[in-house]
């Protein structure tokens, strides 16, 4: 299944690159010096697998592909990484391989600016997802507040959810294993995590996000089990 290969690529990225061998004829690889480009590429593929977008696949990404549909380089600056537009809402996904305390300095301003621009562009709710191998607590604090002043000093409260790649991978797998691979499940997670951001500090919010991921996965699994039982009883 394509989604399983996508999850395997994510696992390689979490490890910082490497190879995964299925058999002698099937090997996937993330070159260690190309992890930023591959992170954007695999999150793009994950978005296409979840599907239901109203914009075209090439409109979602800002990076270029080679003849084998592998990433040539990461997207340039000036705009967000992945714009996934659905019928009722838009999710802007930003990714980084940065894990140090410099993460907030490099990503805090541009991510908020890109989400702000998207809020002004789309005539529908816009949600941000920030995905990194590790989320620095200062980055989480910036997105917890989510404040941005647009042109004309218009104050915006942005919804940006910071997730580790491991958390996203686990949620992604659960969506497919339970038959809930749809963008609404991502929005549910974002909205659930945002409910607590005003009453928690950054370390507590990071812990709550981790708990929320597990709770949402558990809910999907329980619903799948109850649906199976109902189907069996009907038969």
Task: Describe the function of each predicted region.
Residues 1, 224-235:
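Nuclease-adjacent, charged terminal/linker segments that flank catalytic cores
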Residues 2-221:
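Catalytic core segments in nucleotide and nucleic-acid processing enzymes
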């Amino acid at each position: 299944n394509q989604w399983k290969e996508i999850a395997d690529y994510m696992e390689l990225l979490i490890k910082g690159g490497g190879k995964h061998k299925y058999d002698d004829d099937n090997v996937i690889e993330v070159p260690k010096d190309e992890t930023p480009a591959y992170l954007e590429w695999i999150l793009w593929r994950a978005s296409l697998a979840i599907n239901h977008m109203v914009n075209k696949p090439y409109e979602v990404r800002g990076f270029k592909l080679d003849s084998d549909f592998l990433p040539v380089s990461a997207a340039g600056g000036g705009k967000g990484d992945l714009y996934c537009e659905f019928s009722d809402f838009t999710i802007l996904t930003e990714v980084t391989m940065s894990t140090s305390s410099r993460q907030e300095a490099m990503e805090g301003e541009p991510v908020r600016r890109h989400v702000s621009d998207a809020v002004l562009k789309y005539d529908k709710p816009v949600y941000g997802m920030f995905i990194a191998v590790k989320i620095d607590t200062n980055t989480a604090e910036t997105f917890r507040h989510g404040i941005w002043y647009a042109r004309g000093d218009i104050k915006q409260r942005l919804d940006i959810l910071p997730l580790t790649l491991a958390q996203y991978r686990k949620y992604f797998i659960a969506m497919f294993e339970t038959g809930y691979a749809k963008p609404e499940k991502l929005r549910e997670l974002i909205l659930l995590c945002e409910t607590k951001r005003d009453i928690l500090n950054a370390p507590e919010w990071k812990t709550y996000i981790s708990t929320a991921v597990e709770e949402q996965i558990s809910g999907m699994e329980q619903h799948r089990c109850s649906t199976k039982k109902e189907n069996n009883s009907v038969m």
